[in-house]
Design a protein with these regions (language model features):
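Active-site pocket-lining segments that scaffold enzyme catalytic pockets across diverse folds
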Residues: 1-8
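Dual-mode signal for accessory low-complexity, basic/Gly-rich regions
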Residues: 8-195
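Accessible peptide chain termini
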Residues: 1, 195-197
Length: 197
């Protein structure tokens, strides 16, 4: 962002997610794996609501990049503390039933993202879910898209659990492009994608 090469440049106070999305970074969660009173520069940390009803409210800023961006440090030298997506209002089971065919991703492989444009492409494995029922495993597939589009097509389940320093409930992402071997044929189609983090 400070170099002007991020797809999130100049996006503060703009809607980048769907309006149901709220994202927090809370350094004071009791027994949180990322909890801390001060960041790596000794700046006191505080709770940040990074995304408020889909609107980007803050960047993660330390003193060095704060000067470059003309922003005050928000105690994020070294990155996030306890970052999480607020849970949604739909149950996990009902989320799987929202669409007739859903690809449930359990693992991503590799890293192929362009943070300038927001384009990305990663290998993945998971399961095909039909009408809420897990049918068969899938592997050697590639999921691709653009973060700008993906962020606005997320629906969150209500199954948020705090297991790591970054946490999210199961999320349904609509309109992803999937390519790979599908049983004996090749699939190249838009499907609904569920990520379990």
């Amino acid at each position: 962002i400070a170099r002007g090469t991020s797809f999130l440049k100049d996006k503060i106070n703009e809607e980048i997610f769907s309006t149901s999305i709220n994202v927090f970074d809370k350094p004071d969660i009791v027994k949180g794996l990322g909890s801390r009173y001060f960041d790596g520069e000794g700046v006191k940390t505080k709770e940040l609501k990074l995304v408020d009803q889909g609107v980007l409210k803050h960047y993660l800023v330390d003193t060095y990049y704060g000067k470059k961006l003309n922003l005050k440090s928000n105690g994020r030298s070294g990155g996030t503390s306890n970052l999480y997506f607020e849970k949604g209002s739909i149950s996990y089971k009902n989320l799987l039933k929202l669409n007739q065919r859903t690809l449930y991703i359990t693992e991503t492989i590799g890293h192929g993202s362009n943070l300038v444009t927001g384009d990305y492409s990663v290998g993945a494995t998971g399961f095909m879910v039909e009408n809420g029922v897990f049918k068969y495993p899938v592997s050697e597939i590639t999921i691709a898209g653009n973060f700008n589009d993906m962020f606005k097509n997320i629906t969150l389940a209500d199954d948020l659990e705090f297991k790591y320093s970054t946490n999210a409930p199961t999320m349904l992402i609509e309109g992803m492009v999937v390519a790979g071997k599908w049983r004996t044929s090749v699939l190249l189609a838009q499907v609904f994608l569920v990520l379990q983090l």
